[in-house]
Every structure is written in C-alpha cells, then in structure tokens.
Amino acid sequence: MALERSDVEKIAHLASIKLNEGDLPHITSALNSILGLVDEMQAVDTDGIEPLAHPLEASQRLRADVVTESNHREAYQSIAPAVESGLYLVPKVID
C-alpha cells in the first residue's frame, strides 16, 4: 500500500497537524518506507512459531516483599498546616 500526497494531507488534517508544503514529499516518502517495512514483516511465515513475551527464557530473582520502613504518617501530619480525616488540606488554586 502506497500513500499519495492527498492521503498524507488527509491524515495530517485528521490529526490536526499543520504540514509545510515543502515537507510533504519527504513525509510521504518516509511514511511509504514505514508501510513497506510493515508489508515485509506481514509477509514473514510465522506458522509453528510460538509467541514470545520476551526473547530470553530468563526469570528475575525477586526479593521478599518485606516492609523496611515504618509509617511516619502521624509525625508528618502533626506538622502540616491543615489536616482532616487523615488527608492534607491545601488551598484551592483553580477557580
């Protein structure tokens, strides 16, 4: 599938992108190159190939999920200018 100038102009209009007239040939060529690459990838025979989440069969060593810090919420809220029901109150900044 090859894009023409009118296709690129329509895509730019739909995306609300303003393009310079001088850039249209370059952009059209670049988009056609990308679509050509997609066509090449679509042509590859992938029958019998299992989908992969990752190309390597490696697993990560994970640490134990252990709490390492204590809860300082009360100490932080005791010095806050305004707190209500455990939430910090801040001044309204948008009308």
UniProtKB/Swiss-Prot annotation:
Keywords: ATP-binding, Ligase, Nucleotide-binding, Protein biosynthesis
Catalytic activity: L-glutamyl-tRNA(Gln) + L-glutamine + ATP + H2O = L-glutaminyl-tRNA(Gln) + L-glutamate + ADP + phosphate + H(+); L-aspartyl-tRNA(Asn) + L-glutamine + ATP + H2O = L-asparaginyl-tRNA(Asn) + L-glutamate + ADP + phosphate + 2 H(+)
Transmembrane intervals: none
Superkingdom of origin organism: Bacteria
Enzyme Commission identifier(s): 6.3.5.-
Keyword check for Lipid biosynthesis: no
UniProt similarity note: Belongs to the GatC family.
Organism of origin: Pseudomonas fluorescens (strain ATCC BAA-477 / NRRL B-23932 / Pf-5)
GO MF annotation list: asparaginyl-tRNA synthase (glutamine-hydrolyzing) activity; ATP binding; glutaminyl-tRNA synthase (glutamine-hydrolyzing) activity
Name listed for the protein in its UniProt record: Aspartyl/glutamyl-tRNA(Asn/Gln) amidotransferase subunit C
